[in-house]
Each structure stands twice: as structure tokens, then as C-alpha cells.
Amino acid sequence: ANKELDDLKLKDHYNYNVYQKLTLALNNITADSLRESKLFKQYPFFREQVEYCADIDKNILPLSVDETLTQVVYRKKPESEKHIIKGINSTGVNELFNTGDMLTTVLKDVFQNVNVYEDRVRLLQYPFDSPISDNGIGFYRYYIMDTTYVDKDKCFQLSFVPNNPQDFGFTGTLYILADSTYRLKQCLLNLPKKTDVNFVENMIIHQQFGALPSGEWVQTTDDMLCELNFFGGHFMVRRSTHNSDYSFLETPERVFKKKGKEIKDANAMMRNDEFWSRYRATELTKSESNMGGFVNKLADIKGFKYILFGLKALIENFVET
């Protein structure tokens, strides 16, 4: 594959929007648990919150959903980059206790950005060879599977696995443009379970790339899904990221005079439905949309404060690991 993403930092100015959705859910809700669990029998609204996740072929029960819209702005001379948080929308069980923000921070740390264009990728505190790196040629074995279309682009479909089955590396599929550029159009990466990454059972990474009207080749989609198991609880976390609205026009000077790299807009927490309908790149599922009602019913349960105490302890233990 062509190993070059167009380096936007060669431009004098650029800005673009990053929409991100982070969902935390109970995982692996089986037919037996739906039928036999006292929780689902006693509180039908829990059953109503369960939905199917096609990516892992399991039923899940979403507990919280966090959305952010961030504008990334860059100036070459003098060099400066700012992340302006335009919108924040958070609903779910993390609203009910102080640890919620801490959990979101930890999950975002677990879900670090993976840049496959770098030779070495660091994920879950481990280094991995990228499947399109110079080292990858020796580490992975590649198989040409098919010629297919991604969006409207004709691509070669390549599967890859570590050369040595004992080695800890990605498995997955690359989609390379079937033209003279050989650019990476899409990649699907799977991270197999490793015993000493004690809480991660499975991780799936999906990235997509495309050309801007002005010709630059940029990342448009960066999605990650992780199945976790800690203290006997099965959880799924999904992060959906979409980059859009690229512009190379000059950003007003006043933006770069603000202190700190991350700047929160004064109205970020007060955005209305119209705002989110405009910028939401990944639609909310039925259960995610119903999160507010789910939390209200949860808070009405008799003895809920004891359940909350247990949830808080579980999350604090996870944060410490």
C-alpha cells in the first residue's frame, strides 16, 4: 500500500470537525439471562433496553452514551493547534455518580487513536507492527482474497495474519485502491485476546480514508469496539469517530490567543437536538435514544442507592486497573 497520508501540516491553515460517540454497554446478554434473571423479570424496562449488536453478534444493554463535537484548527506560522469543543452530550448511568467522568476519561485512554501509517502502533500499552509498515512485510502473511468496491472505489481485498501464530499481532483485512496510487481505502483490524491484557477479550478497529474535493487523502472514519471482562462483568465499549468539513481557509487570529490546546465553548453543554441532528455522523440506536428514560426508571427503583454503590465500586476498581 502507498504509505503516505497527505500531511495536512504542510498547509498554512486547516480546520475540520470531529464527531465522536462513546457507548458503554453490558455485553453478552443471553436468551437464558433474559428468561431467568431476576433483574429482567422484576424490571421489564431492563429488557426493553437490550438490543442486538451486529459487529459482535451479541445482545447488549447500553448504559451510557457520550457525544462530543470538536473543531480542530491549525496554523503553520507560528505553529499552533487548538481543539475547540463545540458540543458535549452525555446521558446514562455515569450521570448518577461522580466517577462517571473518570470512567469516560479512562475509556478514552484505552481507545487511543491508532495510526496505521506509523510503523509501530501502541495500543493497550503494547507496541504492534502496522500491517502497512516496512516491518509488517516480515511480520505478517498476506493473502489476496478478492477485488471489490468500497463506496465507489474499486479495491484489492487483502487478508493478513502474523507469520508466526505464536506472535501477538493484528489480524484483519486491508482494502487497497486498484489503481496506480495503491492508497489504503479501508482497514479492519482485530486484536486477539492476550492473557496479560486481563480485561480485554476482543478489540475491533475499523478505519476508512477518502479524497477531499481538493485532492488530499485523509482519514474519514475511525471506529473501535472493545469487549471487556472484569470482576465477572461483561462489558462492551464502542467509539465511533467521523472527520468532516475540512477547510484550508485562514482561522481568525483570536482563536490562537486562547490559553491551552483544548478549549471548551461556553455553550458546549447546552446544544439542542437541532445541533446534534446536524453534526451527528452516527445515528443513535433505539436504546441510546431512550437513555434518559432508562436512567429515570433506574433511579426510581426501591433500594437503588445500594445498586448505585455497587456500580460505583465496580467502576472505581476498573479505573484503578
Regions inferred by a protein language model and the residue ranges of each:
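Structured extracytoplasmic
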Residues: 1-157, 161-169, 227-320
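Short, hydrophobic/aromatic-rich segments at coil-to-beta transitions
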Residues: 13, 151-159, 183-188, 216-221
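Short conserved beta-strand segments at catalytic cores or DNA/RNA-binding microdomains
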Residues: 159-162, 173-182
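Short helix-loop boundary/capping segments
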Residues: 166, 179-180, 188-191
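Extended lipid/amphipathic-ligand handling interfaces
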Residues: 173-178, 204-213
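Transmembrane beta-strand segments that form the barrel wall of outer-membrane beta-barrel proteins
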Residues: 187-193, 319-321
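Outer-membrane beta-barrel proteins
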Residues: 192-202, 206-209
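Cysteine/selenocysteine-centered motifs that mediate thiol-based redox chemistry or coordinate metal-sulfur cofactors
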Residues: 208-231
